[in-house]
């Protein structure tokens, strides 16, 4: 996320930094991580039906990591229904996707195979709380259009390629 959506990364991270500063009892699952929540799906044959994660930040990114032992050519594909594609999703791979706005699922795997997932995400409510001045919506006098400004959070290809030196791989970026 830091590499492909650095502005969104900083916004997410600063929101959690502020939350931690205001409440010392709040701790992240992983230090300096920009996503607030983590779900471990232990399987042994984790699959999902087509869904959108409607409580996540609509213009945020969700991280999904696939684990286990299965043949990614035969099953465990990530299906992005709105795009009309199924993507091979091998074990120990991670993808970032806007899970609140893209209908997604994954395909089943073989009877003798295993598949688990780790999903990381942030609730839209955390960002609304920040936009409302750290007060409930009914109490705040802040503008209620905070969710309308996501366009500047995403990187353009030319911005990303400017950060890459000749011969450097994208995966080597900070």
Question: Residues of each region from the PLM?
Answer:
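Catalytic core of Fe(II)/2-oxoglutarate
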Residues: 59-60, 69-174
């Amino acid at each position: 996320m830091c590499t492909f959506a650095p502005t969104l990364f900083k916004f997410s991270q600063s929101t959690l930094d502020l939350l931690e500063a205001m409440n010392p009892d709040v701790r992240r699952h992983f230090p300096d991580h920009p996503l607030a929540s983590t779900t471990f799906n232990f399987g042994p044959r984790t699959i999902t039906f087509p869904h959108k994660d409607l409580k996540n930040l609509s213009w945020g990114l969700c991280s999904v990591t696939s684990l286990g032992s299965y043949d990614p050519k035969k099953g465990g594909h990530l299906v992005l229904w709105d795009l009309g594609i199924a993507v091979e999703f091998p074990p120990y791979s991670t993808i970032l996707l806007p899970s609140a706005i893209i209908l997604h699922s994954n395909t089943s795997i073989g009877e003798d195979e295993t598949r688990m997932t780790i999903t990381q995400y942030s609730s839209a409510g955390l960002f609304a709380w920040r936009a409302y001045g750290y007060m409930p919506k009914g109490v705040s006098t802040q503008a209620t259009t905070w969710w309308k400004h996501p366009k500047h959070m995403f990187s353009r290809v030319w911005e990303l390629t400017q950060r890459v030196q000749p011969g450097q791989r994208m995966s080597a970026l900070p």
